[in-house]
Amino acid sequence: MRIHQSIHKYGPHIEAFELRHGITVDTKISFSELHQLIVDDGYASVYRLEPTLDNLNNQVFFTVWNYERLQLLWAKEHGLAENCTMNDIRIAQVRWFQPDVIYDFSGRYRPDFI
């Protein structure tokens, strides 16, 4: 079973995370590298599904849907337009991953979002 798990960012944590890891606008990093740092750092670990913790990314795709730096890296690597929105990226990720289940922690979206 393929699961797309999405959670929203907590601004102060992302700022502290980037400071702790020396991430700036000039940092050269890929989506996979930044994503792995987030997972290793324990971001939202109490909410993440166990396969994400075990790095079984072929079964679970976990992302922080409104963490701009992360999502824009994914968008660039997947050929999305530079002016795409976080929602555009989110939908593209679901279409790309083709999950059986969408597990979303952002209460602002209703099921008809997808």
List the predicted regions and their residue ranges.
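Extended catalytic core of nucleotide-activated donor transferases of GT-like folds
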Residues: 8-11, 39-55, 64-114
